[in-house]
A protein has these predicted regions:
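ATP-dependent small-molecule kinase phosphotransfer cores
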Residues: 4-78, 84, 89, 107-111, ...
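Phosphate-binding loop of NTP-binding sites
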Residues: 91-96
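Conserved AAA+ ATPase "SRH/arginine-finger" region at the nucleotide-binding site
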Residues: 102-105, 155
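Phosphate-binding beta-loop-alpha motif at adenosine-nucleotide cofactor sites
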Residues: 97, 147-163
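Conserved AAA+ ATPase "sensor/coupling" helix adjacent to the nucleotide-binding pocket
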Residues: 112-117
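C-terminal alpha-helix
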Residues: 167-178
Length: 178
């Protein structure tokens, strides 16, 4: 979910070219909903290249994190996805009940992204972009991509979407029974 928010920020900045990005994003994020965000096509290569740079900005991260917390606190139980949800957003009040960390080889991940992009971008470019983004996410100063200690590791290289969901579902069932 946080990835979508950063992608939405990138789309807005690319399309509207504001002079002051932070003021612009604060205003845009005041009254926004998940439904408003998912209406947009946010998985273009142009947005993907822009989002990794934008996500390093501490002020942008603060705006996105505040929106996430508002949305999370509105709900009693919620499923949230993002590269720093367990490590930065839901570390306390509310704290996550369960965290997953997904690992996949660059080759498989790039191929899957390439298919998502309907093969409109050369696979070589998708691979290069994904490698750079993952590197930037892991090395950024603010909220780097890390696996939290108690996260359940799911290696998705050799798993179908159905198999990944089954693993997650089993883990969720165990937590809900306790």
């Amino acid at each position: 979910y946080s990835g979508l928010l950063y992608r939405y920020c990138s789309k807005l900045i690319i399309s509207e070219k504001p002079k002051n990005k932070i003021t612009f994003l604060r205003k845009k994020f005041r009254n926004i909903s998940y439904k408003m965000i998912v209406k947009h096509k946010l998985h273009s290569e142009k947005i993907s290249n822009h989002v990794a740079i934008l996500a390093k900005n501490k002020k942008v991260r603060k705006i996105v994190n505040e929106l996430q917390m508002r949305m999370i606190k509105k709900n009693n139980r919620v499923c949230v996805e993002g590269r720093d949800i367990a490590s930065k957003i839901l570390v306390k009040d509310p704290k996550y009940d369960l965290a997953f960390y997904f690992k996949c080889s660059l080759k498989i991940a790039a191929h899957r992204r390439w298919l998502d992009l309907k093969k409109l971008v050369p696979l070589r470019e998708v691979t290069k972009s994904l490698k750079a983004r993952t590197y930037l996410d892991k090395k950024r100063k603010n909220s780097p991509l890390i696996k939290v200690k108690d996260a359940i590791l799911i290696r998705s290289d050799k798993l179908s979407k159905k198999q990944v969901l089954a693993k997650m579902s089993n883990s969720i069932d165990k937590v809900l029974k306790n």
